[in-house]
Swiss-Prot record:
DUMP binds at R21, R126, R127, R166, S167, A168, D169, N177, H207, L208, Y209. Its main location: cytoplasm. It comes from the Bacteria. (6R)-5,10-methylene-5,6,7,8-tetrahydrofolate binds at H51, D169, A263. The keyword Oxidoreductase does not apply. Pathway: Pyrimidine metabolism; dTTP biosynthesis. It comes from Methylobacterium nodulans (strain LMG 21967 / CNCM I-2342 / ORS 2060). It is an enzyme of class 2 (transferase). This is Thymidylate synthase. The keyword Membrane does not apply.
């Protein structure tokens, strides 16, 4: 995970102080890219413990097209609670855009199903793109998409994914995002009978909140540990049939968690 630690160092060394929507203040850099070869291990940060249940359940929730926190809460995941309304709704956020992008004629587009089918039909396509950034729906979203567009690429029977993230909370959010999209790539490769390739993470505004700087320095003082391995249930043949118990992370031995406040 050296690429992630290099991001933290770059922000600490070169970041510019900026104001932000939350009023917390950040150190920020613009334009940064990381690359993770998924054959080398599952890219989970080891210099602090991540909450695996949240990562896995959130991705399954996205893939189900769900935009209410009830499923997450029933599985002990609270990462979206701060943005939900009194009914648990978040508006047309990620799951809605991924699975049911509204069309002008009243219909909808299932972008995930489409990209799976298109990979099977035309693996060399340069249109293997899924977008969560729908300007017509932004005002109705509890939180505008931070990780807003991703593209797949197939070469030598390896499936790679590149994510563009417009806004990247480097301490709390980015480790989750890396793991989530690495997991999505591996799950898609599994059902497509491909091997996982690279996960490429391209960041726009990459920032450390002012109240995360000390925690980032603490994390960088720790030694990295070997990456864990991902094991998926071989009996699952549809992306939409995965359940929590079908995803197993083996050999995850991180340093203790480092607490930091969420900027809302």
């Amino acid at each position: 995970m050296r690429a992630y630690h290099d991001l933290l160092r770059r922000i600490l060394d070169d970041g510019v102080a900026k104001h932000d929507r939350t009023g917390t203040g950040t150190l920020s850099v613009f334009g940064h890219q990381m690359r993770f070869d998924l054959a080398e291990g599952f890219p989970l940060v080891t210099t602090k413990r991540l909450h695996l249940k949240s990562i896995i359940h959130e991705l399954l929730w996205f893939l189900a097209g769900d935009t209410n926190v009830a499923y997450l809460q029933s599985n002990g995941v609270t990462i979206w609670d701060e943005w939900a309304d009194e009914h648990g709704d978040l508006g047309p956020v990620y799951g809605r855009q991924w699975r049911s992008w509204a069309k002008p004629d009243g219909g909808s587009v299932d972008q995930i199903a489409w990209v799976l089918d298109e990979i099977r039909r035309n693996p060399d396509s340069r249109r293997l793109v899924v977008s969560a950034w729908n300007p017509a729906d932004l005002d109705r979203m509890a939180l505008a998409p931070c990780h807003c567009l991703f593209q797949f690429y197939i070469a030598e029977r390896r499936l790679s994914c590149q994510l563009y993230q417009r806004s990247a909370d480097a301490f709390l959010g980015v480790p989750f995002n890396i793991a989530s999209y690495a997991l999505l790539t591996a799950m898609m490769a599994h059902v497509l009978d491909l091997e996982p390739g690279d996960f490429v993470h391209t960041l726009g505004d990459a920032h450390l909140y002012s109240n995360h700087v000390a925690q980032a320095r603490q994390q960088l003082a720790r030694d990295e540990r070997p990456l864990p391995r991902l094991r998926l249930n071989p009996e699952v043949r549809s992306l939409f049939d995965f359940r929590y118990d079908d995803v197993v992370i083996e050999g995850y031995d991180p340093h203790p968690a480092i607490r930091a406040p969420v900027a809302v």
